[in-house]
Amino acid sequence: MAWMLDCLFASAFEPRPRRVSVLGGAPGQNSDRSMDMVSIHSLSELERLKLQETAYHELVARHFLSEFKPDRALPTDRPNTLEKWFLMLRGQDRAASLKTFGIRLEEVLVNELTRRKQRELTPTMQVEDINGSTGRRRRGNVVQRMLGRMRRFFSRRRNEPTLPREFTRRGRRGAVSADSADELENGALLLQILQLSQLSSPIGQRLLGSKRKMSLNPIAQQIPQIVETCCKFIEKHGLSSVGIFTIEYSLRRVLELRELFDKGLDIVLDDSVNVHDVAELLKEFFREMKDPLLPDDLYMSFLLTATLKPKDQVSALQLLVYLMPPCHSDTLERLLKALHKITENCEDSIGVDGQLVPGNRMTSTNLALVFGTALLKKGKLANKESRKTKLGIDHYVASVNVVRAMIDNWDILFQVPPHIQKEVAKRVWKSSPEALDFIRRRNLRKIQSARIKMEEDALLSDPVENSAEAQAAILAQSQPFDEDPEGAPDVHEVLNDNLNYDFEDESDFEDQDHLDLAEVPYLDVIPNNEDTDSDADVIPGPSEEPAVPASTAGSPDKEEGAAGNPPNADRPLPRVPQGKKGKFATRFFP
């Protein structure tokens, strides 16, 4: 018993004879100075899929997915039965049948989008009913529409999304990307659309043999309204509430809030709402979710991380987060962010007015005890074992350890380190070299636009002072010609070499010796300041002739007398830039 309590409240479990070494160094440390960690939200859909492939193969190589079998990914049934479809033919029944609690996360997002669209179409439907000529004609129109919808329903392919056509213009991509924002009248609805073609698909079905077209733009965040609303309210009113998520609540008020969210109304929680009622509502949402927030096909893999050292555990959790569907990972990140803010206010502090602010007493361990079993639940795809795992660790204790580590390191879990970015770049290039080039150039344009905006904002705030400071900074960073360091790279040459790298020129893409992706910026590109009229596909080399100033160019009449001394022999020759072979720097000599 003492050993179990030790495991529960210690930072990690006792060392085991066999440990799993995870790819990469310590979490949060960047071993490659040329690249920075980036958020998974900045990755396009194609990059996100390649990131999942990279994490999957890495975890398989480290024996983290030994319990996972891809052949368990069987086709799923239609999410809507015939009886439910008949109930949804009418607008009122359809809106009332779309729930929020007790269903899968994907269905929650789909229902929110459907309810919003239904509210927009309700006035139009009422006008059509008023303008109808006779009741029989209206009944005939209803029957005709019902039969037409039934024909379309039964003629729909098995794995086709169940939303209307206007909802799924980008459904073939499996996830809605930011480039489809202009295709919807209300851009806010875009955030609620999700991976419709991958609905309820286990990890094996998501990774094996996908032939869908992928977007090259980032995926929109997919967070349910109830999670976003409750987290915002708790962050605003509950950070100083002692014992939040554990104090008694009003059951009647929780049921009222639950009914409001089931109706799909745009709920605004004001100061009159008790924060403990909102906290209980959030707990019930995750507890009653049909599928756990952490996918059940990764259940044993998450528990296995509890046997690692803290550094290796966070790295393993990072790879497992990459394998989660976007809607699950986005919702998990939003929840962990709110829980981490609560832990930052667990101790007493002194306020701005000098008064003592009591802490909420909710550490990461206490919060993990509350959400451990709600986030990590054994589902239908998990092996039916006893409560003790093969490693001799209690499931409950292991789940608390995992959730606690995720709360403490929530900001690292959703970042992509440089060495993973390199692997993703390899896989993207192997599938589509043009896509990799497009992504790099797009990121370059974003960086250029951001820097231009920063400069404009600085000049607008104080034009005279900031312009002088900017010029002084540029002059301070520029070095004299005679003090040029040996081998210093030129920004333009490095950028051109990176953007126009020939992968097929006597180099194997899989060979690390021939291709060092550390010098090829993937998601953190060096800004390109070259002229827009220049040809970016031409890489200047040392074989080009140096530009000679017009004042030193000899006339054709004097070329024949090259053996003689020029008229201005007594004057010193001007310094002419000369490309030095094998060096990136530009040397000047007299």
UniProtKB/Swiss-Prot annotation:
UniProt GO MF annotations: GTPase activator activity
Site label Arginine finger, positions: T246
CDD domains reported in the protein's UniProt record: RhoGAP_ARHGAP6
Annotated Rho-GAP domain residues: 214-414
GO-annotated biological processes: signal transduction
Segments of this protein annotated with the region Disordered: 526-590
Keywords: GTPase activation
Known function: GTPase activator for the Rho-type GTPases by converting them to an inactive GDP-bound state.
Description of how the protein assembles with itself and partners: May interacts (via the Rho-GAP domain) with the active form of RAC1.
Protein name: Rho GTPase-activating protein 36
Organism: Mus musculus (Mouse)
Gene name for this UniProt entry: Arhgap36
